[in-house]
């Protein structure tokens, strides 16, 4: 969505600013550091807002599934939500200098990919001929290094 794209762009900007920072000194370096701090604060605010919206969407989709457990679209949408959340976390990981912190974020991202996988798998169980669902599953399997499953999904996706 729009919020996650904006956050991703801000991480890119932070990466570039921090690279420039190595060649700066004095007031220019301070201004650069202030800009990075401001971007990080903005990302934090937007991330909290995005998390609130995501949580609400997940709750609503789970209600749909309770009422209509064969709704493949609801499972697919949950898969998309978790896959997007993973992508945002991978962006955050890539913009994190502290290796221990980056490893924790990487673990969170992979947990979200596994949630996406479970929902995409359920969607394909309900609607096995939907190539779009298989393409999404292929992407997740590939990201998780599940190459045999990725290959099978690729065939079912008609790729």
Predicted regions and their residues:
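Short coil/linker segments at helix-helix boundaries
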Residues: 2-56, 84-119
């Amino acid at each position: 969505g729009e919020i996650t794209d904006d956050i991703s762009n801000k991480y890119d900007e932070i990466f570039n600013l921090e690279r420039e920072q190595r060649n700066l000194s004095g007031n220019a370096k301070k201004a650069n550091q202030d800009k990075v701090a401001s971007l990080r604060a903005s990302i934090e605010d937007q991330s909290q807002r995005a998390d609130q919206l995501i949580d609400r969407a997940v709750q609503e989709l789970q209600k749909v599934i309770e009422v209509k457990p064969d709704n493949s679209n609801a499972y697919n949408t949950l898969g998309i939500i978790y896959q997007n959340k993973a992508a945002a976390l991978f962006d955050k990981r890539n913009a994190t200098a502290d290796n221990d912190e980056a490893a924790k974020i990487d673990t969170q991202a992979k947990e979200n990919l596994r949630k996406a996988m479970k929902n995409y798998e359920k969607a394909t169980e309900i609607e096995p001929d939907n190539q779009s669902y298989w393409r999404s599953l292929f992407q997740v399997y590939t990201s998780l290094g599940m190459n045999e499953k990725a290959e099978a999904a690729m065939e079912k996706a008609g790729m």
